[in-house]
Amino acid sequence: GEEEDVERARLAVTVVAEYADAVRRAGTPMPAGEERLLLDQVTAELVGLGRLQTLLVDTSIEEVHILGCDRVRITRHGGGVDWGEPIADSDAELVEILQAAARRAGATERSLSTSKPTLDLQLPDGSRLAAVFLVSQRPYAVIRKHNTLDVSLDDLAGARADLDEMIDPLLRDFLRASMRAGLNIMVAGLAGAGKTTVIRALMGEIPPDEPFVLLEESRELLPTQHGGRHRAVMSFEAREGHGERGLDGRPAGEVSIADLIPVSLRMGVLRIIVGEVRSREIVPMLQAMTTSRGSMCTIHARTPAGVGERIIELALSHGREMTVDQARRMAGNALDLIVYVTVEDETAIGGRKHRFVSHVEEVIGVGDGNRITTTAVFGPGPDGRAVPRHLPERIRDQLLRVGYDARLLSRWVEAGAGAWRRPRNSRLARR
């Protein structure tokens, strides 16, 4: 537990201090840098994450691929790649480290074992860890770090030089008003595009005393660390099942996101936020959105045009009673906005990764042919980043009620331009 970790960390300080004092008395004092490094290593071993800890404290790292104990591929912010030192002395030791991480995974039970050879959890620093062994050639793990826990729409609009400018001030003001108006928003994009960052910034617009429910497979959005501003959030985490499967085919003790959504509706909140919809939980999520306001979720989709079909694909996994037409009507009634986040990776040509919002689609409803109908309120400009395209229709009055007049975008729509503060600096644009 957390108290045990604190005690182990104190023990590490004591042990290293006594060792440093002993070598000092022997006439060979340790340089301050070496003493600090030794303390980091001893703390990491005692707390249970071993050499993983040195990767977690390095804020320049974005993602780590552990391909066995001795192959550690490190991706840094901006897309640079290098190879790190071995993470363990053997694959068996690596598995022990991963199992130790699973035991410290917080309130919900996680394990990595012969009966459960995959693992998905949040590490103490907020990073996301996925691991697999036995069914793979060697033990593999991926760590996605979250160095930016406290982020606002202002930050995404260029207020912080250390972050990508993902939106411009026009889109910032539109999204801020959309949150005040209680619109239901789906944030879509590829893995690693920045969906979590965008939804964190949107969460920052929720009043600090407003109760809302946050549902995640493993905790990633971290509202309690989100600047400390969300005092009334109720955070739920799915629980993996273990042992024999019941008559419904599910392992004993499993509690899924789909199970938790009906519970959330009884918690007296207007907003429900699902970290990611990836399966049958999309149906209860959309059902909840039809009776709530200001709810949000993220979804994986390759293209903006593919979001609707992705929704249908997931909805059909809910059961035989769900049809394509039902899924479309449900999405058309539940969603107000779809925000698409794009990532363009230019590292192969000596550039970097660029992350930005490229589309904001207003969901109008279900139109001819029973298709989900949308209007591009913001769409790609000359460099791919979102600029105003059309004035919103269905949500216009809701925005007006919170003091946002969308007609302010008219001149920008006519000009086909946005208000981005910094150039994108794409290598492709310079060719």
Task: Specify the residue positions occupied by each region the protein language model found.
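Active-site phosphate-binding and catalytic loops of NTP-dependent enzymes
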Residues: 48-57, 102-121, 210, 318-325, ...
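NTP-binding/hydrolysis catalytic cores, primarily Walker-type P-loop NTPases
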Residues: 349-431
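N-terminal accessory targeting/assembly segments
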Residues: 1-112
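P-loop NTP-binding catalytic core
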Residues: 75-181
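Hydrophobic positions on the alpha1 helix immediately C-terminal to the Walker A/P-loop
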Residues: 198
